[in-house]
């Protein structure tokens, strides 16, 4: 995984710098998201791995599948990625691009998993508190998991806050073992 990220980083950085210079971050994010989805299709994966096809043929087919969703610069990006046999890295490239975009926008995606559904007021309060703690705008994504028993688990990048009953029981069990 780290190797894929290392290989994808220069492409994501180049796309980000181009998009930022032309004030097209949202467009490029959408285009790369589409490219990532297309590259993960089983049929497309077989085509991209086919040794008998040239990089130009792979790029042309990829661009044809995406239709008019790609502007000229995005099509060139796909051609360059194909020339260097990096089309299979498009999911990693898109993820890194979105990470750079979030850093630029001073925002962070936060996954909140709770034992019970959070209403909008609770989500708003939680987003406000997390925004103050993280010093960034928070985009909250809430989900439910009854296995937590109670409480919440918050994931923001590398930060994980486990305030669930299940997490506390696991910590207590670990403490009793030692």
UniProtKB/Swiss-Prot annotation:
Function text: F(1)F(0) ATP synthase produces ATP from ADP in the presence of a proton or sodium gradient. F-type ATPases consist of two structural domains, F(1) containing the extramembraneous catalytic core and F(0) containing the membrane proton channel, linked together by a central stalk and a peripheral stalk. During catalysis, ATP synthesis in the catalytic domain of F(1) is coupled via a rotary mechanism of the central stalk subunits to proton translocation.
Annotated protein name in UniProt: ATP synthase subunit delta
HAMAP family, per the entry: ATP_synth_delta_bact
Cellular localisation: Cell inner membrane
Known partners and oligomeric status: F-type ATPases have 2 components, F(1) - the catalytic core - and F(0) - the membrane proton channel. F(1) has five subunits: alpha(3), beta(3), gamma(1), delta(1), epsilon(1). F(0) has three main subunits: a(1), b(2) and c(10-14). The alpha and beta chains form an alternating ring which encloses part of the gamma chain. F(1) is attached to F(0) by a central stalk formed by the gamma and epsilon chains, while a peripheral stalk is formed by the delta and b chains.
Membrane topology summary: Peripheral membrane protein
Gene Ontology CC, one term: plasma membrane
Keywords per UniProt: ATP synthesis, Cell inner membrane, Cell membrane, CF(1), Hydrogen ion transport, Ion transport, Membrane, Transport
Lipoprotein as UniProt keyword: no
Family of the protein in this entry: Belongs to the ATPase delta chain family.
MF terms (GO), sorted A to Z: proton-transporting ATP synthase activity, rotational mechanism
Gene that this polypeptide is encoded by: atpH
Principal location: membrane
